[in-house]
C-alpha cells in the first residue's frame, strides 16, 4: 500500500469508529498505535531490534559521559545525531543548537545515527550531553521481559473489529508494551537523576511513552518543530489526541504552522509559539562566500538536490535523466545519509556527503526535492524549488502551501524540466517569509516561562 493510501485508510477509520475510547491504564493508545499501523501497511519503519541496531546501541553507550545526567539541569533536550550540520569545524544542531551557543543549563540526550553513532566531543559544542542509547537499551529490554504479561486494553473488542474490518494484521499488544516500556524507562531515568524543569523534544511522536512519564511527574514538554508540520504529515492530522502523550507547547517555524495548529488542530497542544529555526540564521551569517565560485566559470547554473531516505533511488534516477541532456548545468546531489546504491552516469552530477545543505541552498540557483522541508528553507535563501512530484507526494504535501509566484514548480517527468526551469530561473519572485526571525530570543523567551 502506498503512503497516501495508508493515510486515507487511517482517516477513514477515525471517522467511522470511536478510536479514542481504546485505552490502556486510562490513556488513549490510538494516537500511538495509528503511527505503527500505518507503517505496518507501508513497510516504512523498521521496528525490529536487529543485530546491527543492538550493536550500535551498545557501542554508543559511552560515546559521551553518562554521568553528566547526574547533574541538575533546567532543561533536557531530546534530539538526534542526524540533525547536526557542519558549521566550520563544529557539527551544530540545526534545531536545538541555540542551547549550547547560549550556554543554557541543558542536558542534551541524543539518539545515535544509524550506521554511525555520534560525533566526537571535539566536533560538537555541547558540554553536557549523553547518548539516548541508555534509554533505548533499557526500554527494549523492558519490552522483551514484559512479553509474558498481556496488557489489559479497554474497548479491545473495538480495536479487534477495526483490524478485522480493514483486513489488517497488526500485533497491537506488542506496541502497547513498547509504549509502557518507554514510559517505565523514562520513569527510571527520572528516579535516578535530578528532574529537569522542562523537556524539549524535536520528534515527540516517536517517544510518546517518554511524554507519559514526564506528565506523570508534572514536567512540561515543549516540542521543537524539526520538519514538515501540516495536515499532510501523518503525526499532525489525527482526529483526536491524548494530552498525556502530546506536548504542552509547540515551537513552530513560522506563521503557517502557527495557523494550522491554532485554527485547525488546537487539540494537538495547548500553546503554540513561533520561534523560527536556529540553523538558518547561523548558516546565513557564517556562509558568506559563494561555494560555487569556480564552478560558475564552467556551468551556466547550479542545481542542488536534497535527497530523502525513502526516495533516494527514484529521485537520483530522475536527476540523472535530466542531467544527461543539460551539460551546461551542474547538478549537486546531497543525500540525507551515506549510501552506496546511488549511482549517476552523467558527468555533470556530483554526489556529495556530509556537507551543510544550507550552505549549498544559499548559493544554488535552483533546488530540487520531492517533499523535503529544504523546500521551505530554500525560501529563506530566496532559492526557487522544482518539486519532483513522485507518486503525487509533492503536490499532496505542498501544492496548497506554495503559490507559483513563490518560485516553485511541480513536475512528474524529466521532459517537463525545461518548462519549469525557464519559468522560475532568473525571474523576480515573491518568496514566502516562512521562518520567524530572531530565533534565539524567541526560544529563550519560551524557555524562561518554564524555568523561572
Report residues per predicted region.
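Catalytic-core helical/loop segments in enzymes performing group transfer/polymerization on anionic/lipid-linked
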Residues: 1-452
Amino acid at each position: 500500500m502506498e503512503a497516501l493510501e495508508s493515510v486515507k485508510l487511517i482517516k477513514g477509520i477515525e471517522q467511522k469508529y470511536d478510536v479514542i475510547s481504546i485505552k490502556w491504564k486510562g490513556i488513549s493508545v490510538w494516537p500511538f498505535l495509528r503511527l505503527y499501523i500505518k507503517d505496518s501497511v507501508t513497510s516504512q519503519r523498521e521496528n525490529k531490534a536487529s543485530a546491527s541496531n543492538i550493536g550500535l546501541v551498545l557501542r554508543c553507550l559511552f560515546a559521551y559521559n553518562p554521568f553528566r545526567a547526574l547533574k541538575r539541569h533546567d532543561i533536557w533536550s531530546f534530539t538526534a545525531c542526524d540533525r547536526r550540520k557542519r558549521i566550520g569545524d563544529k557539527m551544530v544542531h540545526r534545531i536545538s543548537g541555540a542551547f549550547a551557543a547560549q550556554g543554557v543549563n541543558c542536558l542534551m540526550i541524543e539518539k545515535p545515527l544509524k550506521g554511525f553513532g555520534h560525533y566526537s566531543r571535539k566536533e560538537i559544542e555541547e558540554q553536557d550531553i549523553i547518548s539516548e542509547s541508555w534509554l533505548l537499551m533499557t526500554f527494549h529490554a523492558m519490552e522483551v521481559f514484559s512479553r509474558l504479561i498481556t496488557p489489559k486494553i479497554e474497548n479491545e473488542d473495538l480495536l479487534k473489529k477495526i483490524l478485522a474490518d480493514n483486513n489488517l494484521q497488526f500485533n497491537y499488544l506488542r506496541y502497547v508494551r513498547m509504549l509502557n516500556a518507554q514510559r517505565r524507562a523514562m520513569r527510571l531515568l527520572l528516579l535516578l537523576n535530578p528532574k529537569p524543569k522542562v523537556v524539549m523534544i524535536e520528534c515527540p511522536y516517536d517517544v510518546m511513552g517518554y511524554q507519559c512519564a514526564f506528565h506523570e511527574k508534572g514536567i512540561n514538554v515543549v516540542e521543537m518543530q524539526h520538519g514538515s508540520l501540516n495536515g499532510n504529515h501523518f503525526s499532525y492530522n489525527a482526529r483526536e489526541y491524548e494530552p498525556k502523550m502530546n506536548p504542552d507547547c509547540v515551537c513552530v517555524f513560522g506563521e503557517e504552522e502557527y495557523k494550522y495548529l491554532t485554527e485547525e488542530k488546537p487539540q494537538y497542544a495547548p500553546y503554540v509559539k513561533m520561534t523560527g529555526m536556529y540553523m538558518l540564521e547561523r548558516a546565513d551569517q557564517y556562509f558568506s562566500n559563494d561555494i560555487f565560485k569556480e564552478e560558475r566559470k564552467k556551468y551556466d547554473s547550479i542545481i542542488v538536490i536534497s535527497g530523502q531516505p525513502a526516495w533516494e533511488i527514484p529521485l537520483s534516477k530522475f536527476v540523472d535523466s535530466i542531467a544527461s541532456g543539460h551539460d551546461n548545468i551542474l547538478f549537486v546531489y546531497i543525500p540525507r545519509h551515506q549510501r552506496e546504491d546511488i549511482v549517476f552516469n552523467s558527468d555533470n552530477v556530483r554526489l556529495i556527503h556530509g556537507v551543510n545543505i544550507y550552505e549549498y541552498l544559499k548559493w544554488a540557483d535552483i533546488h530540487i526535492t520531492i517533499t523535503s522541508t529544504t523546500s521551505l528553507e530554500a525560501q529563506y535563501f530566496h532559492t526557487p524549488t522544482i518539486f519532483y512530484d513522485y507518486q503525487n507526494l509533492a503536490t499532496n504535501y505542498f501544492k496548497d502551501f506554495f503559490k507559483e509566484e513563490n518560485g516553485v514548480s511541480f513536475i512528474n517527468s524529466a521532459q517537463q524540466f525545461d518548462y519549469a526551469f525557464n519559468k522560475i530561473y532568473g525571474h523576480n519572485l515573491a518568496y514566502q517569509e516562512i521562518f520567524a526571525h530572531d530565533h534565539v530570543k524567541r526560544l529563550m523567551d519560551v524557555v524562561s516561562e518554564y524555568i523561572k
